[in-house]
Amino acid sequence: MDVLPMCSIFQELQIVHETGYFSALPSLEEYWQQTCLELERYLQSEPCYVSASEIKFDSQEDLWTKIILAREKKEESELKISSSPPEDTLISPSFCYNLETNSLNSDVSSESSDSSEELSPTAKFTSDPIGEVLVSSGKLSSSVTSTPPSSPELSREPSQLWGCVPGELPSPGKVRSGTSGKPGDKGNGDASPDGRRRVHRCHFNGCRKVYTKSSHLKAHQRTHTGEKPYRCSWEGCEWRFARSDELTRHFRKHTGAKPFKCSHCDRCFSRSDHLALHMKRHL
């Protein structure tokens, strides 16, 4: 909330003209502004708790049925277009060459990437009926796959599995492939402004937020569950918080620490947003 000061610059000049100085001590009005900011923060409504039983996912059988039906429908349409399609045309040489090239590029990029980020493909193939089914069916649940959500195997596109030669298991290089080497390519997921892919998605009903780090996703999910693991260690204080930075700001109330100092005057503040509000007085 942006609270505009009632005292204008002309009144301040009048005080300086009459007394010869302007007191830097906080006035009653400034105390009122700080109190309004604190009340607005701590009187917010608590997030409602959502039990795990209320989260509904598609069953594994239904998902695989949709995948198989989509694949059969795609094959039937290909048979209608070409009267006698040879089996070798299902895997074109250019497609295999792209897979090999993508695997080499992904091996180089994965070694220099951060270990906390997931490996996810950024290239999207033109004909991918399985991907359309996955998009229409919603989110993948933990019952669909045995790997955890942070596993790189979840970020593998289904078209890479169907593109392999029958009877041949996909190699680790092909599983990790997907980056075409072009900086302008975009994948299925949302891309953040700094170029990193946001691959950590919230699976609660009605929430579509995506994050680049798993720690940020865990902090966001606490707003759904109501979990507050960070407790104030001050004697006699029972406050609990969902994020560590909220606990740090709260602890400054006990210690009286004010690390944020104004560069124009000697005023100090315990929070950065309070300093930003104060800096508007110097503009």
Swiss-Prot record:
Pfam families: zf-C2H2 (PF00096). Gene3D superfamilies: Classic Zinc Finger. CDD domains: KLF6_N. Its main location: nucleus. GO terms for biological process: B cell differentiation; positive regulation of DNA-templated transcription; positive regulation of transcription by RNA polymerase II; regulation of transcription by RNA polymerase II. A motif (9aaTAD) lies at residues 62-70. A zinc finger (C2H2-type) spans 200-224, 230-254, 260-282. The keyword Flavoprotein does not apply. SMART domains: ZnF_C2H2. Residues 106-198 are annotated as: Disordered. The keyword Nucleus applies. Residues 183-196 have a biased composition (Basic and acidic residues). InterPro entries: Znf_C2H2_sf (IPR036236), Znf_C2H2_type (IPR013087). Keywords: Activator, DNA-binding, Metal-binding, Nucleus, Repeat, Transcription, Transcription regulation, Zinc, Zinc-finger. Highly expressed in placenta followed by spleen, thymus, prostate, testis, small intestine and colon. Weakly expressed in pancreas, lung, liver, heart and skeletal muscle. Also expressed in fetal brain, spleen and thymus. Changing S116P: Found in prostate cancer samples; somatic mutation; does not up-regulates CDKN1A in a p53-independent manner and significantly reduces cell proliferation. Residues 133-148 have a biased composition (Low complexity). Belongs to the krueppel C2H2-type zinc-finger protein family. This is Krueppel-like factor 6. It comes from Homo sapiens.
